[in-house]
Swiss-Prot record:
Pfam families: Peptidase_M74. HAMAP family: MepA. Transmembrane segments: none annotated. Dimer. This is Penicillin-insensitive murein endopeptidase. Zn(2+) 1 binds at H110, H113, D120, H211.
Length: 275
C-alpha cells in the first residue's frame, strides 16, 4: 500500500507541470453519437454536451475555462443530484471541472477528467446564490485540519455528508474521491446505513471538493472502467494507512504520458487535418 501511495504522489505532483496539450485547442465538441473512449486518465469523448450554465439547483464555476462538458450520462447525474439537493434544502450545488469539449489530457490540474465521466463538486452549499464574480474566482473552504488527520469541526456541516451520500447512492456513480480526513469523518457519522461508504475513496488533496466518477456508459464500447471498489465500508485498516508517514523515497523523475487510445489519436489527427 505504502509503495503504491508513494508512486501515486509522484503522479499527482507531476500533473501541474505537464506541457500544454492539443486537446485545449479543440473549442467545440466532436460531432457524433456520444461515446466515452479509453480510460478516465487517458481518453477522450465524442458527442460531449455542455452543462447548461443556468439552473435553479446548481451553479457552474470558472465557466471561462470551458471545462463544463461531459457525456450526457454525466449531465443527467448532475441534474439528478442537484435536484435532490434542492428538494432536501441542502443549498446550491457548486459544479467545478468536468471535461474539455472533446475530453483529453489537461495541461494542469487533473490527470483524469478525460473521458467525460468525471466532475468535481465543491463541499460547500451556499444558501445564497453566488455572484458572477464569485463564480469566476471561487474561494474554496479547506475542510481539513493542518495535520491532515481530521476535519475542522466548525466547518463540517451535516449537509456536506448528505450531499456525498446522495451522490454515492446514485446507480451510475462508481467512485467518489475525498480527502482521507473527510472519509474518516463520514465513517464516524454514518451510523447503521453504511453500504454507500464503499464508493467513497480516500485520495490525496480533495480537501474542499469531491471528485465523482461514473461508470462507463452501456453504448461506449471503447470505454475502460475501473475495477469495482473492494467490498465493505472502507473504514478500517486501509483508511488508517493514509494517516501513516510515507517511507523515504528517491525523488521521482519525469514520466511521459501513455499513448492515446487509437480512436482518440484519430480524433486529434482528423480535427487538426481539417483546420
Amino acid at each position: 500500500m505504502k509503495n503504491w501511495i508513494v508512486g501515486m504522489v509522484a503522479l499527482v505532483t507531476m500533473v501541474p507541470v505537464m506541457a500544454a496539450t492539443p486537446w485545449q485547442k479543440i473549442t467545440h465538441p466532436v460531432a457524433g453519437s456520444p461515446q466515452s473512449i479509453g480510460g478516465f486518465a487517458n481518453g477522450c469523448v465524442i458527442g460531449a454536451q455542455p452543462l447548461p450554465l443556468e439552473s435553479a439547483d446548481y451553479q457552474v464555476m470558472r465557466s471561462d475555462q470551458r471545462r463544463y462538458f461531459g457525456h450526457p450520462d454525466l449531465l443527467n447525474f448532475i441534474h439528478r443530484l442537484s435536484a435532490q439537493a434542492h428538494q432536501q434544502q441542502l443549498g446550491t450545488v457548486l459544479i467545478g471541472d468536468m471535461a474539455m469539449p472533446a475530453g483529453g489530457r489537461f495541461s494542469s490540474g487533473h490527470a483524469s477528467h478525460q473521458s467525460g465521466l468525471d466532475v468535481d463538486i465543491w463541499l460547500q452549499l451556499p444558501k445564497q446564490r453566488w455572484s458572477q464574480q464569485q463564480l469566476l474566482k471561487p474561494q474554496p473552504i479547506d475542510l481539513v485540519a493542518v495535520d491532515g488527520k481530521r476535519v475542522i469541526p466548525a466547518l463540517w456541516q451535516p449537509q456536506i455528508e448528505s450531499l456525498i451520500k446522495l451522490a454515492a447512492k446514485d446507480n451510475d456513480v462508481t467512485r467518489i474521491f475525498v480527502n482521507p480526513a473527510i472519509k474518516k469523518q463520514l465513517c464516524l457519522d454514518a451510523g447503521a446505513d453504511r453500504q454507500w461508504l464503499h464508493k467513497v475513496r480516500p485520495w490525496f488533496a480533495h480537501r474542499a471538493h469531491m471528485h465523482v466518477r461514473l461508470r462507463c456508459p452501456a453504448n461506449s464500447l471503447e470505454c475502460v472502467d475501473q475495477d469495482t471498489p473492494p467490498p465493505g465500508d472502507g473504514c478500517g485498516a486501509e483508511l488508517e494507512s493514509w494517516f501513516q508517514p510515507p517511507p523515504p523515497s528517491a525523488k521521482p523523475g519525469k514520466t511521459l504520458p501513455p499513448p492515446l487510445p487509437p480512436s482518440c489519436q484519430a480524433l486529434l489527427d482528423n480535427h487538426f487535418a481539417t483546420e
